[in-house]
């Protein structure tokens, strides 16, 4: 039986694959916790991480999405939610860039993770949706994935409406970075990866460090951080080799 999630390494490139195509790559909380561990480990040992799903769809979210679940006390609900918040943290705190590759549908948690990738390349047939309100779920867990990625009006529309959007609209909303013909998706990702492989590793890591922090700073603080990081990294001898 195939593993539901897989991590492979080729040189210093790590690929994390959601590998349940027969169920739209839905995962249980236990396997989402495993994905978190994979990102933490892969981030320490690579220059970049490619995140993708097997089959026709990127990811349709959590295994139990839309199904009846036992009524839990608030503290137990909070403890259960930590699995997803820890997963979000692994994306945000990774020391290397994460490239998301989205084909087909990205729904619920799948849509949140597509947004959390540093760069998200989507095929033109990709579709994105947060359906939680249609299932009588108040979706602040999903919403929190977007607060540093997606403008307020766009995020509010997706959460309140539960409507599916296409790849071009996801691009304007800030969920996707680029949209390419679906048949060219692998080629577009390979081209980007080859470019990043040629960059000095200190530059790859420094760009992620800056992106992780700068957008939460004041303009002056972000400028000061850029000034320091630029001087520190570009004067390093390893940038020339």
Task: State the predicted function of each range.
Residues 51, 84, 143, 152-155, ...:
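A general structural signal for well-ordered alpha-helical segments in protein cores
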Residues 1-14, 42, 58, 162-168, ...:
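C-terminal alpha-helix plus adjacent terminal tail
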Residues 30-34, 83, 90, 188, ...:
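Charged catalytic carboxylate motif
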Residues 2-5, 89-201:
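Crotonase-fold acyl-CoA enzyme core
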Residues 44-45, 53-87, 106, 218:
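Glycine- (often His-adjacent) and acidic-residue-rich active-site loop
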Residues 1-54:
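Conserved CoA-thioester-binding segment of acyl-CoA-metabolizing enzymes
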Residues 36-40, 88, 111:
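Short hydrophobic/charged patches on amphipathic alpha-helices used for structural packing
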């Amino acid at each position: 039986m195939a593993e539901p999630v897989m991590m492979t390494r080729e040189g210093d490139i790590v690929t994390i694959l959601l590998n349940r195509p027969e169920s739209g790559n839905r995962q249980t909380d236990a396997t989402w916790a495993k994905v978190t561990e994979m990102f933490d480990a892969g981030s320490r040992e690579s220059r970049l991480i490619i995140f993708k799903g097997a089959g026709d769809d990127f990811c349709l979210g959590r295994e139990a999405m839309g199904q009846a679940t036992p009524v839990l006390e608030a503290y137990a609900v909070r403890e259960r939610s930590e699995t997803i918040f820890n997963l979000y943290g692994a994306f945000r705190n990774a020391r290397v860039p994460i490239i998301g590759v989205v084909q087909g549908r990205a729904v619920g948690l799948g849509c949140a993770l597509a947004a959390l990738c540093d760069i998200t390349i989507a095929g033109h047939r990709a579709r994105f949706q947060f359906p939680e309100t249609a299932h009588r779920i108040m979706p602040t867990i999903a919403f929190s994935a977007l607060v540093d990625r997606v403008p307020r009006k766009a995020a509010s529309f997706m959460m309140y409406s539960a409507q599916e959007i296409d790849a071009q609209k996801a691009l304007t909303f800030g969920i996707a970075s680029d949209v390419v013909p679906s048949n060219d998706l692998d080629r577009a990702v390979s081209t980007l990866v080859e470019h990043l492989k040629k960059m000095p590793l200190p530059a790859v890591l420094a760009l992620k460090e800056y992106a992780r922090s700068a957008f939460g700073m004041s303009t002056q603080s972000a400028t000061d951080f850029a000034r320091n990081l630029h001087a520190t990294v570009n004067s390093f001898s390893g940038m020339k080799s």
